[in-house]
A protein has these predicted regions:
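Transmembrane-helix signature of polytopic, membrane-embedded enzymes
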Residues: 31-37, 179-182, 199-221
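Membrane-embedded, hydrophobic transmembrane alpha-helices
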Residues: 1-94
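Transmembrane-helix motifs of polytopic, lipid-linked glycan transferases
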Residues: 74-86, 183-206
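Membrane-lumen/periplasm interface segments of specific transmembrane helices
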Residues: 113, 123, 284, 291-364
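Short acidic/glycine- and proline-prone juxtamembrane loop motifs at membrane-interface regions
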Residues: 230-237
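Membrane-interface alpha helices of multi-pass inner-membrane proteins
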Residues: 215, 260-276, 282-287
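Extracytoplasmic catalytic/substrate-binding loops of multi-pass membrane glycan-assembly enzymes
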Residues: 123-137, 143-168, 178-179, 328-330
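Membrane-interface transmembrane helices that cradle and orient dolichyl/undecaprenyl
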Residues: 245-260
Length: 364
């Protein structure tokens, strides 16, 4: 029952995400609709965590924010559906012609969901980083009240990590009324399903239904995917956001819809809000979008991208400057920058990479 309530607690944020996506990207064909649906979790959870963080940073109670959010999200999705009746229509699939592929997809999705559930039951607290970082911070936020910032007194294991995952779990616990392990399990199970769904919908929109089924079934069949999805870390979330940003970037080259740049900028900004490793992704995507703007000879592309990026990135900058302690990796003796100039490190990487590729070639 608590697991079901955890899923219900996540739904308003998914509704909020869909509302935002559809407001920016008004394509109404079935293939685009699937992409919107499976992007909704990332956008919705991201917006919620950003606003929730700013709310509690201002000294306001998280409980009040959580209830305002659910009311607003439900009202917005009701208004959206009432104004866009075509959204009620499901994407058309020739069931008779595609019955075999649909069965293959359904069976794969069923086994994937069962694997995720069994992993969650086996490791209800996640794996080590979840115990000592992500879920601990969420407990400080939920249980700490006005003293939630004492979480930054922790001086072990990246105390400067941003708050996408902790805020999302803390808001879920507000609805559950306790720090139940089912809250994080539901979040990461939902994210794992949405990653697979987004992968399917992107292949479907760029290729076709059969190739999408084949690709996603192979994807979810890897034990690595289940493991990463349910460890309760932020790595899989970061991969999901980068996948969404990359997929929409490719879509822009086909549709020429510059407004998608707003979503790309927002998604890649959320990547940095999810984990420090998302910061290099911002640099990479920013350079890519500058290149696209030059190629298409329009600065509207980069303008839309930067507008989408500004809210999550500015929030992250404020968090890093005024709240987060110094990064434990960057503050070690000697610093990180001098190590970047040690050519022996690059030689070791090249040697190991060559050895790995050589072995793969021999096995073929």
């Amino acid at each position: 029952m608590t697991l079901l309530l955890s899923f219900i607690a996540l739904l308003p944020r998914i509704f909020l995400g869909f509302f935002i996506i559809h407001s920016v990207w008004n394509a109404k064909d079935g293939k685009s609709l699937l992409v919107k649906i499976f992007l909704s979790a990332g956008v919705g959870f991201g917006v919620s965590s950003l606003l929730g963080f700013l709310w509690i940073w201002g000294g306001l109670p998280l409980t009040v924010y959580a209830w305002i959010e659910i009311i607003v999200a439900i009202l917005l999705i009701i208004w959206l559906l009432s104004q866009n009746r075509e959204l009620w229509r499901m994407p058309q699939i020739a069931v008779k012609q595609e019955f075999l592929w649909l069965s293959f997809l359904a069976l794969g999705a069923l086994f994937f969901a069962l694997n995720l559930i069994f992993y969650g039951l086996q490791y209800p607290h996640g794996r080590p980083d979840a115990w000592i970082n992500w879920n601990v911070v969420a407990r400080f936020i939920y249980l700490g009240g006005t003293d939630w910032q004492t979480t930054f007194l922790r001086q072990w294991d990246h105390p400067d990590y941003p708050l996408f995952v902790p805020m999302t779990n803390a808001i879920t616990w507000v609805f559950l009324g306790s720090t139940s392990t089912w809250g994080p399990i539901a979040l990461h199970l939902m994210l794992s399903l949405f990653v697979a769904g987004l992968f399917f919908s992107l292949v479907n929109i760029f290729r076709d239904f059969k190739q999408a089924v084949l690709a996603v079934v192979f994807f979810i069949a890897f034990p690595f995917i289940t493991n990463q999805g349910m460890r309760q870390y932020a790595d899989f979330l970061l991969a999901y956001l980068i996948l969404g940003a990359g997929g929409l970037t490719l879509l822009i080259t086909q549709t020429k819809d510059n407004r998608l740049g707003l979503l790309v900028g927002f998604l890649i900004g959320l990547g940095a809000w999810a984990k420090n490793e998302g910061l290099p992704a911002i640099l990479g995507f920013s350079l890519l979008w500058v290149g696209l703007s030059f190629q298409q000879k329009t600065w509207k592309l980069i303008q839309h991208y930067l507008v989408g990026l500004v809210f999550p990135f500015l929030t992250l900058v404020l968090f890093k400057i005024f709240l987060a302690p110094s990064n434990d990796l960057m503050s070690v003796a000697g610093g990180a920058f001098p190590k970047l100039l040690e050519w022996e490190r690059y030689l070791t990487i090249l040697q190991m990479g060559w050895s790995l590729l050589w072995e793969l070639g021999r096995r073929r």
